[in-house]
Amino acid sequence: MAKAKFERNKPHVNIGTIGHVDHGKTSLTAAITKVLGFLGSAEYKAYDQIDAAPEERERGITINTSHVEYQTETRHYAHVDCPGHADYVKNMITGAAQMDGAILVVSAADGPMPQTREHILLSHQVGVPYIIVFLNKCDMVDDDELIELVEMEVRELLSSYEFPGDDTPIIRGSALVALESTSTDINSPEYAPIVALMKEVDNYIPTPERATDKAFIMPVEDVFSITGRGTVATGRVEKGIVKVGDEVEIVGLMEAPKKTVVTGVEMFRKLLDQAEAGDNIGALLRGVQRTDIERGQVLAKPGSIKPHTYFEGQVYVLTSAEGGRHKPFFNGYRPQFYFRTTDVTGVIEIPEGTEMVMPGDHITMKIKLITPIAMEEGLKFAIREGGRTVGAGNVSKIIE
């Protein structure tokens, strides 16, 4: 069957849900597709369709990022449902990097929890520019004053991570009430909070200025082979434009970049002549074996970005209250560094005269990776150890 062409008639925005486990991120995502489905601009995806990876069902928690798409009257959205559980912060780091704005889901019954804080911190570190709050499960709280208190707490938390807490839109509602309603009228009261939320998302999150005029780069998230056609690399175009027939380089996780040609581009299972910054795509690559390319590398315009192993980074070390280390670390500390979609072990050199680095410190340090990563100044990374985030930073200077 021939694939339909993807129509680019509305501005495209990438958003996602973040927040503590069981506060209702996936239910809210399902409710948005249900309500916008009444306008004919979304396909309703039930909770268990979004929560779809096999290992998720047994635990009832979301592990991988799920992508859904929908439209409002003014925009086309790609929505990622980000993992909420602390074990899966690793995926949050790769998922949150794909957001022009985020919907922070907070249960009105529980208020902000440890992962609420962690996700706000991560959003700040990976550069999610806007956060809107959906205060979920309001049907479970009878006392308005309690909801007011939760709202104040959330605003303070946002402000403490440099988001404009006082001006952040907060919508109260219940995703479950919207999901359980049998009404097909979008004006039903149980759908009002979802309608109000999407209106705020339309208005508060600006249409991103896409970096389309910059050199093409796409971090590789996944790779698979299509029999008879070749190898496809999937990911979100970070900058620039890629056209069918363009020469690109595979950069990172190896000494020298490899050249190839993009022979096909598709998005949401539809073929495109070209893809631009912000698009989640699959790129078909000429003459590339399934084993020649892997998650953590990037596709880039030839010569535009180089692989490096040694750099200076500005680093913030999390406190134990933020889920970080309880103890300091010293010169020669070897954690994992998460860049874009993968982790690489590196060795830390702390500045002369500094004996150790304490939780809560903000420090400039040199980092030597064991494998090269496609790198430019300003690139963000997270520092991880034993499955948890212990620091965050960005590349301030490339040494070699």
UniProtKB/Swiss-Prot annotation:
Its EC number is 3.6.5.3. Residues 60-64 are annotated as: G2. Belongs to the TRAFAC class translation factor GTPase superfamily. Classic translation factor GTPase family. EF-Tu/EF-1A subfamily. It comes from Ruminiclostridium cellulolyticum (strain ATCC 35319 / DSM 5812 / JCM 6584 / H10). It catalyses: GTP + H2O = GDP + phosphate + H(+). NCBIfam families: EF-Tu, PRK00049.1, PRK12735.1, PRK12736.1, small_GTP. Residues 174-176 are annotated as: G5. This is Elongation factor Tu. Keywords: Cytoplasm, Elongation factor, GTP-binding, Hydrolase, Magnesium, Metal-binding, Nucleotide-binding, Protein biosynthesis. It is found in: Cytoplasm. GO terms for cellular component: cytosol. GTP binds at residues 19-26, 81-85, 136-139. PANTHER family: ELONGATION FACTOR TU, MITOCHONDRIAL (PTHR43721:SF22), ELONGATION FACTOR TU-RELATED (PTHR43721). Residues 19-26 are annotated as: G1. One of its GO terms (molecular function) is GTP binding.
